[in-house]
Amino acid sequence: MALVVEDIVKNFGEGLSETKVLKGINFEVEQGEFVILNGASGSGKTTLLTILGGLLSQTSGTVLYNDTPLFDKQHRPSDLRLEDIGFIFQSSHLVPYLKVIEQLTLVGQEAGMTKQQSSKRAIQLLKNIGLEDRLNVYPHQLSGGEKQRVAIMRAFMNNPKIILADEPTASLDADRATKVVEMIRQQIKEQQMIGIMITHDRRLFEYADRVIELEDGKITD
């Protein structure tokens, strides 16, 4: 299985005020592959990631998953559930009144897991990141790095087929950033997901299978 991006164009505005943000983007990401998107501010990275996640519609072009358009004409997932696409953002966005384990189990239950299944999955993921002793604490009791690790595991809670990460390490120091990317890569490889991450940090490029460079809405050679 693969995610195939075919000639994606995105324009904002109309007429004289029209801005062309993406100008014919083509690439493919295989199952189990971890790809980094890089480019200067305004190059179109976040717009592209947002389109891939179904949060924004393209002006033209197609995104295919398993040889099927990822979204139908009403822009709903056609071959995937929404839960099959996991998002990781720069900020953790944890719910302040939920305990750490509840941040994950709630996601699992909303996706159809039983309470027992959700709890078992959440505990295992939190063990993977060394937070098994923090299950019952609240976000304000966590460090910034711990919050981000919880947010990352939350994105993996439903075993999504596609992971999209937008600058997940931007607020972390070099050591924590490395650990976070190693964690993301490990999950993608072990679960054979499709992973795409935006980052400006060239020190992290070595963890990717490929780096795709964007410039002025186009992929550079």
Curated annotation (Swiss-Prot):
It comes from Staphylococcus aureus (strain bovine RF122 / ET3-1). Residues 3-221 form the ABC transporter domain. GO terms for cellular component: plasma membrane. GO terms for molecular function: ATP binding; ATP hydrolysis activity; transmembrane transporter activity. The lineage of its organism: Bacteria, Bacillati, Bacillota, Bacilli, Bacillales. This is Putative hemin import ATP-binding protein HrtA. Gene3D superfamilies: P-loop containing nucleotide triphosphate hydrolases. Disulfide bonds: none annotated. It is a peripheral membrane protein. PROSITE patterns: ABC_TRANSPORTER_2 (PS50893).
